[in-house]
From Swiss-Prot:
It is found in: Cytoplasm, Cytoskeleton. GO terms for biological process: actin filament organization; erythrocyte development; mitotic cell cycle phase transition; muscle contraction; myofibril assembly; pointed-end actin filament capping; positive regulation of mitotic cell cycle phase transition. InterPro entries: LRR_dom_sf (IPR032675), TMOD (IPR004934). The keyword Cytoplasm applies. Binds to the N-terminus of tropomyosin and to actin. Interacts with FLII. This is Tropomodulin-3. GO terms for molecular function: actin binding; cadherin binding involved in cell-cell adhesion; tropomyosin binding. Its main location: cytoplasm. The modification Phosphoserine is found at residue 25. Coiled coil: none annotated. Blocks the elongation and depolymerization of the actin filaments at the pointed end. The Tmod/TM complex contributes to the formation of the short actin protofilament, which in turn defines the geometry of the membrane skeleton. The gene is TMOD3. One of its GO terms (cellular component) is myofibril.
Length: 352
C-alpha cells in the first residue's frame, strides 16, 4: 500500500515552493492562509515571529524620502533655541564636606600588681629552675621553652634530653564500613510466602530499592492466606500509597501477622489512613512502624492514629513521631494502657 503513495510523491520532489508562492496572486494567497488556518488553527507549526498576520498592507498616504526627512529634522534642531534656565547657576556650594571620623587609639596601661612582701621576696630570689618549675605547675607552658621543659620534666622522670618527647599522638581512626546489602532473595521469599512455608516466619525486605510495585502487592496478596509469617518489614523500599492500600486489605484478612514495618517510604496520608482503618478490625497485629515518610502526614491523620490506638487494645508498639501535642499524649496513654492490660493478663495467668 505504501509504494503507490511514494510514487506519487516523486513528482513533487523537483518543484520550487518559492516560485509557486511567487506566482500566486493576492487573492490566492489569502485563500491559502485560510486553508492553513483550518489545518493548524493555533499556528503551532510556525515560529513565534510568523504567527501574527500581516497588518501593514495599507496604501501609502504620501511619498517618503529618508534623506529629505533627515535634513528637515537637522534644520529644525539648529533653528530651535535652547530654553533659558529660570534659576541661573550661581556656583554656590550646599551641604557639608564629608570628614571621616578618627577612631580613638587604644592605649594599654600596665596594671600594677601588689603582692605580699613574702611572695615578692620569694619570686625575686627564685632561680630560673624554680621559676620554670612554677610555670610548669601552673600550666603556663608559653613562658618556658621546650628545652627548659625537657630539663624539668625529664630530670624528674629520669629521661635524658635525646629520648624526651612531649608530642601528643592521636589515636588511630577506626574505619567505618558501609552496611552490606540486604541478602534476601525477593523472588524466593515471595514463592515461599505463597506456598505458606512453615519455616518462613520473618520476611525482611529493608533497603532493597529495586523491588517493583506489583511484586510488593503480590506479597500483600500472599500474606492474606499465609498462616506462618509473623514479622514483615519493607522499610526504605520506595513503597507508595498503592502498596499501603494493598497491605491494608491484607490486614483485614490476616490473623497471624504480629509486626509490620513500612518506615522510610513514600506513603502519604491516604495510604496511612488506609492502614489505620484496617487496624480497627485487626486483632492480632501488635507492632506497627510508619515513621519517616517523604512528607508530613498532618494533624487530621495523627488524630485518626490516636483514635485507632484508643479503640484497638492489641497494639503494644507504635513507631511514629507525633508532631502535635494532643495526639501524642492520647497515643502515649493508649499504648501504656494496652501494655498494662497485657501485664494484667500475664499476672492472672500466673496465678491460675
Amino acid at each position: 500500500m505504501a509504494l503507490p503513495f511514494r510514487k506519487d510523491l516523486e513528482k513533487y520532489k523537483d518543484l520550487d515552493e518559492d516560485e509557486l508562492l511567487g506566482n500566486l496572486s493576492e487573492t490566492e494567497l489569502k485563500q491559502l492562509e485560510t486553508v492553513l488556518d483550518d489545518l493548524d488553527p493555533e499556528n503551532a507549526l510556525l515560529p513565534a515571529g510568523f504567527r501574527q498576520k500581516n497588518q501593514t498592507s495599507k496604501s501609502t498616504t504620501g511619498p517618503f524620502d529618508r534623506e529629505h526627512l533627515l535634513s528637515y529634522l537637522e534644520k529644525e534642531a539648529l533653528e530651535h533655541k535652547d530654553r533659558e534656565d529660570y534659576v541661573p547657576y550661581t556656583g554656590e556650594k550646599k551641604g557639608k564636606i564629608f570628614i571621616p571620623k578618627q577612631k580613638p587609639v587604644q592605649t594599654f596601661t600596665e596594671e600594677k600588681v601588689s603582692l605580699d612582701p613574702e611572695l615578692e621576696e620569694a619570686l625575686t630570689s627564685a632561680s630560673d629552675t624554680e621559676l620554670c618549675d612554677l610555670a610548669a605547675i601552673l600550666g603556663m607552658h608559653n613562658l618556658i621553652t621546650n628545652t627548659k621543659f625537657c630539663n624539668i620534666m625529664g630530670s624528674s622522670n629520669g629521661v635524658d634530653q635525646e629520648h624526651f618527647s612531649n608530642v601528643v599522638k592521636g589515636e588511630k581512626i577506626l574505619p567505618v564500613f558501609d552496611e552490606p546489602p540486604n541478602p534476601t532473595n525477593v523472588e524466593e521469599s515471595l514463592k515461599r510466602t505463597k506456598e505458606n512455608d512453615a519455616h518462613l516466619v520473618e520476611v525482611n525486605l529493608n533497603n532493597i530499592k529495586n523491588i517493583p510495585i506489583p511484586t510488593l502487592k503480590d506479597f500483600a496478596k500472599a500474606l492474606e492466606t499465609n498462616t506462618h509469617v509473623k514479622c514483615f518489614s519493607l522499610a526504605a523500599t520506595r513503597s507508595n500509597d498503592p502498596v499501603a492500600t494493598a497491605f491494608a486489605e491484607m490486614l483485614k484478612v490476616n490473623k497471624t501477622l504480629k509486626s509490620l514495618n513500612v518506615e522510610s517510604n513514600f506513603i502519604t496520608g491516604v495510604g496511612i489512613l488506609a492502614l489505620i482503618d484496617a487496624l480497627r478490625d485487626n486483632e492480632t497485629l501488635a507492632e506497627l512502624k510508619i515513621d519517616n515518610q517523604r512528607q508530613q502526614l498532618g494533624t487530621a491523620v495523627e488524630l485518626e492514629m490516636a483514635k485507632m490506638l484508643e479503640e484497638n487494645t492489641n497494639i503494644l508498639k507504635f513507631g511514629y513521631q507525633f508532631t502535635q501535642q494532643g495526639p501524642r499524649t492520647r497515643a502515649a496513654n493508649a499504648i501504656t494502657k494496652n501494655n498494662d492490660l497485657v501485664r494484667k493478663r500475664r499476672v492472672e495467668g500466673d496465678h491460675q
